[in-house]
Curated annotation (Swiss-Prot):
Entry annotated with the keyword Hydrolase: no
Alphabetical list of HAMAP family matching this protein: Ribosomal_uL13
Coiled coil ranges: none
Name of the featured protein: Large ribosomal subunit protein uL13
Encoding gene per record: rplM
Lineage start: Bacteria, Pseudomonadati, Pseudomonadota, Gammaproteobacteria, Pseudomonadales
Organism: Pseudomonas savastanoi pv. phaseolicola (strain 1448A / Race 6)
Entry keyword annotation includes Transmembrane helix: no
Key words, A-Z: Ribonucleoprotein, Ribosomal protein
InterPro entries xrefs: Ribosomal_uL13, Ribosomal_uL13_bac-type, Ribosomal_uL13_CS, Ribosomal_uL13_sf
GO function terms (MF aspect): mRNA binding; structural constituent of ribosome
Length: 142
C-alpha cells in the first residue's frame, strides 16, 4: 500500500465562519492556523495547501488574559534607521481589530510561499457582517 499524497487540483476546500466574541486570542488563533493548514483532514500533506477558508467575525470582541491589554506590544519597522513603530493591544484593537487576529495567525503559519497562500484564505471582519454568504460557510465552534 502506497502513502497517499494530496494533489493540488483534487483538494476540496470548505468555508467556515468563526465567531471571535469572547474567545481568547491565542487559543482561537491556533485552531484557525491548524484549519488553514489542513491538519484536521486525513488527506493532509505538508507540501500541499489542503486547508479550508476561514471567515472570522466579531474580531473587535476578542479578549486576552492578564495584563496583555496594556503590556502586549506590536512592532513594525519602515526599513529606515529609527523607523521602528510600536502600538499596544488596547490601541490596536480600537484602531484595526482585524490586524490583531491576522497577526496572531500569520505568526503560526509557515514562513514560505505555501504559508502565504494559506494566509490568503483567512478573512477577518470587525463586526458580525461579512460578504461571504454566497459561499454558504458552516459555523465552526471551538
Amino acid at each position: 500500500m502506497k502513502t497517499f499524497t494530496a494533489k493540488p487540483e483534487t483538494v476540496k476546500r470548505d468555508w467556515f465562519v468563526v465567531d471571535a466574541a469572547g474567545q481568547t486570542l491565542g487559543r482561537l488563533a491556533t485552531e484557525i492556523a491548524s484549519r488553514l493548514r489542513g491538519k484536521h483532514k486525513p488527506e493532509y500533506t505538508p507540501h500541499v495547501d489542503t486547508g479550508d477558508y476561514i471567515v472570522v467575525i466579531n474580531a473587535e470582541q476578542i479578549r486576552v488574559t492578564g495584563a496583555k491589554t496594556t503590556d502586549k506590544i506590536y512592532y513594525s519597522h519602515s526599513g529606515f534607521p529609527g523607523g521602528i513603530k510600536s502600538i499596544n493591544f488596547e490601541k490596536l484593537i480600537a484602531k484595526a481589530p482585524e490586524r490583531v487576529i491576522e497577526t496572531a495567525v500569520k505568526g503560526m503559519l509557515p514562513k514560505n510561499p505555501l504559508g502565504r497562500d494559506m494566509y490568503r484564505k483567512l478573512k477577518v471582519y470587525a463586526g458580525a457582517v461579512h460578504p461571504h454568504t454566497a459561499q454558504q460557510p458552516q459555523e465552526l465552534k471551538f
